[in-house]
A protein has these predicted regions:
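Extracellular "complement/coagulation-type" protease architecture
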Residues: 2-264
Length: 264
């Protein structure tokens, strides 16, 4: 089997049976991988930009609030999605309760996104909400980074993805993990030609990583959004880097969609 076939994207899609850590379960139709393995539970309101994407009420990907009308996520989370079935939950760390539910009127994926055949380059999409969300201590936009984090920087990633690479268990509460930025030259030593300039790589080590369900979620440095969870090597948390969308190279796309300049 080629190296490419060992890649996974970090989204939960329908047919996979997911078991909450409190014993509840969700059934999805097909399985792709993405979760936080080896992370810790976030305090309520500590990550106010984090959102949960729902399809017919079921959580399947993460995202980040970037304006009061816009959510950024991974394009592989929303290919051909029926927006009448899509909602965004903001303002809560729980998958079971709290927060606000928002409808979506438009999904815009990057025009250069192709998918797996192009190694998930430009894996970014922006959701336009049906109504403006109210900024509170529990839900607020995060600034978009215009420069990349330095090599070796500690980055914060968060999500509700699977807790263990060998299990379908997912948390009911938001998890977070500190990972380390690495340059693409070093990243290519492991992930090879699949790593492009539009990818940003980070890792923590064996036993700690993003996984199924974390797709589209935020990668943050110094309070700015530097990346979006995109893809990694299977199994999760095997000690190799994961690939994120490099936000500093997505600014033109973002500005076209949201209709305003990103602060430089």
């Amino acid at each position: 089997m080629s190296l490419f076939h060992h890649q996974i994207v970090f989204c939960l899609v329908f047919g996979l049976s997911v078991i909450f850590t409190n014993g509840a379960s969700i059934n999805f139709d097909v399985g792709l991988e993405s979760r936080i393995v080896g992370g810790a539970q976030a305090e309520e309101g500590a990550i106010p930009y984090q959102v949960s994407l729902r399809l017919n009420g079921w959580p399947f990907c993460g995202g980040s609030i970037i304006t009061v009308f816009h959510i950024v996520t991974a394009a592989h989370c929303v290919p051909g999605i029926n927006i009448s079935q899509l909602t965004v939950i903001t303002g809560t760390n729980s998958l079971e309760s709290g927060g606000e539910t928002h409808g979506v009127v438009e999904v815009t994926s990057h025009e250069s996104y192709v998918g797996s055949s192009d190694y998930w380059k430009y894996d970014i999409a922006i959701l336009t909400l049906a109504a403006e969300l109210t900024v509170t201590s529990l839900q607020s936009p995060i600034p978009i980074a215009t420069v990349d984090p330095p090599d070796g920087a500690e980055l914060l990633v968060s999500g509700w993805g699977r807790l263990f690479s060998e299990s379908n268990a997912v948390p009911t509460k938001l998890q977070y993990l500190w990972v380390v930025a690495i340059n693409n030259t070093e990243c290519r030593e492991t992930l090879r030609e699949e790593v492009d300039d539009v990818h940003l790589c980070a890792l923590r080590g064996v036993g700690s990583a993003v996984c199924s369900g974390d797709s589209g979620g935020p990668l943050v440095y110094n309070g700015t959004l530097v990346g979006v969870v995109s893809w990694g090597r299977s199994p999760c948390a095997s000690g190799v880097p994961d690939a994120y969308v490099r936000m500093s190279l997505m600014l033109d796309f973002i500005e076209r969609v949201i209709g305003t300049a990103v602060s430089k």
